[in-house]
């Protein structure tokens, strides 16, 4: 049918599939994978369109946009105002995987059936500010909206989404965040990323505030231990209440996978990378330890009633990965292989 629920790569940073179908003529399953991107550069103005993933932030992982969810059609631009300021905007078309019964009825008969999903979209913009050679600040805002194919209000790039969302009825899902990069010196840098879901200004300093967060902290140093090497440590933490909205049509998901941090809400990950370069050969050591708690639709509804449980109270799953890889060029031009 197409919209097939599947758990492959559910607890892995590996990009998930949009769908998996059973083969009609043989045993097993099949899927489709396609990425395409067209960019046109007008000096300080870049237009992008296609079907691809983005990565916002300075870390290995991203709380905002990562390549975990299947790629999605989108159009956007980046405008470099001057040497210190840049502005980014995008509009993407997501898959909610929630059947639209009013339209699906037109795609069924005695021998065939197709499932049509209710439209879900995302609009996002980002300001990048290079304060000096030490600090770079980025400020993000996005909105998930659904049930209409396109909303003209969110196509106006310069408008802030938060007041617009309230203006048209408070039916959508707003996210905000920032990234900070601090270059300690030529060899070291540190970074912080912050993601906020469900912004309610008047409740900021209350214990029950409906302002729910995700955090990322990282540190990177070059030439550590060995010359031409790089060491990175990173910690990611997500509240059990982010990404999933009180109306599931507005979840921060595409094809049932989070657009941001790969493990989704109610999770944390500590990772280390150590990379050494030997000419055009690369040796990489990777360690990752992830913990993720239960997160159901019933729990989401309880969160909005301020009845949330303690973190990991109803159980959790853990994942530890240690890997060593070695990449080297082959005798065939532009071909590489790794073990």
Regions found by a protein language model. Give the residues of each.
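Outer-membrane beta-barrel channel domains
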Residues: 1-136, 143, 147, 208-210, ...
């Amino acid at each position: 049918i197409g919209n097939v629920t599947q758990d492959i790569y559910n607890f892995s940073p590996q990009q998930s599939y949009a769908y998996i179908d059973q083969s009609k003529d043989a045993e097993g399953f099949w899927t489709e994978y396609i990425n395409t991107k067209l960019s046109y550069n007008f000096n300080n103005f870049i237009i992008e369109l296609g079907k691809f993933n983005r990565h916002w932030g300075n870390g290995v992982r991203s709380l905002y946009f990562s390549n975990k969810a299947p790629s999605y059609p989108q159009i956007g631009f980046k405008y470099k105002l001057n040497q210190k300021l840049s502005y980014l905007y995008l509009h993407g078309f997501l898959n909610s995987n929630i059947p639209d019964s009013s339209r699906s009825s037109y795609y069924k008969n005695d021998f065939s059936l197709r499932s049509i999903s209710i439209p879900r979209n995302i609009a996002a913009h980002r300001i990048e500010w290079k304060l000096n050679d030490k600090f770079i600040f980025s400020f993000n805002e996005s909105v998930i909206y659904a049930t209409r194919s396109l909303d003209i209000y969110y196509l106006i790039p310069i408008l802030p989404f938060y007041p617009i969302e309230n203006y048209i009825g408070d039916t959508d899902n707003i996210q905000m965040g920032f990234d900070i990069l601090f270059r300690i010196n030529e060899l070291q840098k540190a970074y912080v990323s912050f993601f906020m879901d469900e912004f309610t200004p008047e409740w900021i300093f209350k214990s029950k505030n409906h302002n729910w967060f995700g955090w990322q902290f990282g540190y990177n140093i070059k030439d550590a231990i060995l010359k031409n090497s790089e060491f990175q440590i990173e910690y990611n933490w997500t509240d059990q209440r982010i990404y999933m909205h009180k109306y599931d049509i507005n979840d921060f998901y595409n094809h049932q996978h989070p657009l941001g941090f790969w493990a989704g809400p109610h999770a944390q990950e500590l990772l280390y990378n150590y990379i050494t370069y030997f000419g055009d050969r690369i040796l990489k050591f990777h360690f990752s330890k992830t913990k993720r708690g239960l997160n159901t639709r019933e729990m989401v509804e309880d969160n909005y009633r301020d009845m949330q449980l303690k973190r990991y109270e109803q159980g959790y799953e853990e994942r530890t990965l240690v890997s060593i890889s070695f990449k080297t060029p082959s005798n065939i031009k532009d071909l590489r292989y790794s073990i």
